[in-house]
Amino acid sequence: MAADEVAGGARKATKSKLFEFLVHGVRPGMPSGARMPHQGAPMGPPGSPYMGSPAVRPGLAPAGMEPARKRAAPPPGQSQAQSQGQPVPTAPARSRSAKRRKMADKILPQRIRELVPESQAYMDLLAFERKLDQTIMRKRVDIQEALKRPMKQKRKLRLYISNTFNPAKPDAEDSDGSIASWELRVEGKLLDDPSKQKRKFSSFFKSLVIELDKDLYGPDNHLVEWHRTPTTQETDGFQVKRPGDLSVRCTLLLMLDYQPPQFKLDPRLARLLGLHTQSRSAIVQALWQYVKTNRLQDSHDKEYINGDKYFQQIFDCPRLKFSEIPQRLTALLLPPDPIVINHVISVDPSDQKKTACYDIDVEVEEPLKGQMSSFLLSTANQQEISALDSKIHETIESINQLKIQRDFMLSFSRDPKGYVQDLLRSQSRDLKVMTDVAGNPEEERRAEFYHQPWSQEAVSRYFYCKIQQRRQELEQSLVVRNT
């Protein structure tokens, strides 16, 4: 559909421009040398400034951990959050967080925008994409609301009523040929139908009754009826065959299949509202419009309607609730009038005018409704748009990693010694957190650390714990020996 292609093409073009700007980093009018960092640059956190493992000072043992301080590794399949007792998010929560993360990852950080002023073009494209997505979403909601309402248009259905006469053949071998008979056909088609799909003739009607002359065919064989059922097979026309060699007057009663169902209004209500046959919702809406126009709604209690003389004659009460109107309308709504066509089945061979045409108004589905439905169900260009989104996220992540590497190199070039010391302190803190090591080994290896006031209390506590431990061991050994 044209609207679907336009919407999908606009989104795809916007995504492509976003990705091209991020990859190439050049916008019209930009100097050739001014480029954003290329995606092919190495990624990942900055490596260690030293090569190999650090040397061990003479006289010091290699750094290690006591077995009691080591933390047991979690079992296979258990995450670090589970091993630490933290709640693990469920699948829907992960999907929502991933969606929020993706939306946030498409925005360039402020520090990168300050570093590369040309990146404002990407932010402008991102804002345009957001507006485009919001516009498409609003249009989709409008289309969904429009599809909930009946969308009909008036068309002309031309009926062709024809008949053929088969005279009797005395020398015929079968009984059918020896008796004169006639055949009546009822067919039709839409005039100027733009749709390529031809609609069956019977689909326009709920019932069809052909009433023949009762004097010729008797009270039991003068009616031919067709009524729609849930299992009805649609057909392009109806035909009736009867024996006879006399012209027959017949009456065709055609009941249109209204969708949604329509009703004929009571004559008094029809004069009041100016409607003859309409759907129930249209009748209620017209009645409400009449109430508002004539200010019949109660000024104190909006739920009630104070009827005028016409209103009281129709509903037979001076005052009623608006919620009661649909129930009271049931007695005032009648089945719609059928289409009545009088036709003469002629058996005169000299009568050449045996086909009659009639044009009737029918309601058909708006062709735009099918296009609107296909637009809502269409998934065209979705895979390509998703692929471009993934590339944009990867490119933004690459730019962030390159910014981290640039900051590292820039800080190192400004103050190599201070930056290396800060880096070592940071890595030392991270190592202590990762290995769960308590204390500070660098301070603990110096003698001044043990001359502080807390050392005397620590020694007393240590010996007290050892004495208690030995006492328990001796008591257990004595109990075992006595038994």
Swiss-Prot record:
Domain SWIB/MDM2: 258-335
Keyword Acetylation: yes
GO CC term, one of those recorded: SWI/SNF complex
Disulphide-bridged cysteine pairs: none
Region (Disordered): 26-102
Known tissue expression: Isoform 2 and isoform 1 are expressed in brain, heart, kidney, placenta, prostate, salivary gland, spleen, testis, thyroid, trachea and uterus. Isoform 1 is also expressed in skeletal muscle and adipose tissue.
Residues carrying Phosphoserine: 178
GO biological process: cardiac right ventricle formation; chromatin remodeling; muscle cell differentiation; nervous system development; neural retina development; nucleosome disassembly; positive regulation of cell differentiation; positive regulation of DNA-templated transcription
Complex formation: Component of the multiprotein chromatin-remodeling complexes SWI/SNF: SWI/SNF-A (BAF), SWI/SNF-B (PBAF) and related complexes. The canonical complex contains a catalytic subunit (either SMARCA4/BRG1/BAF190A or SMARCA2/BRM/BAF190B) and at least SMARCE1, ACTL6A/BAF53, SMARCC1/BAF155, SMARCC2/BAF170, and SMARCB1/SNF5/BAF47. Other subunits specific to each of the complexes may also be present permitting several possible combinations developmentally and tissue specific.
Function recorded in the entry: Involved in transcriptional activation and repression of select genes by chromatin remodeling (alteration of DNA-nucleosome topology). Component of SWI/SNF chromatin remodeling complexes that carry out key enzymatic activities, changing chromatin structure by altering DNA-histone contacts within a nucleosome in an ATP-dependent manner. Stimulates nuclear receptor mediated transcription. Belongs to the neural progenitors-specific chromatin remodeling complex (npBAF complex) and the neuron-specific chromatin remodeling complex (nBAF complex).
Stated name of the protein: SWI/SNF-related matrix-associated actin-dependent regulator of chromatin subfamily D member 3
Originating organism: Homo sapiens (Human)
Lineage, opening ranks: Eukaryota, Metazoa, Chordata, Craniata, Vertebrata
Gene: SMARCD3
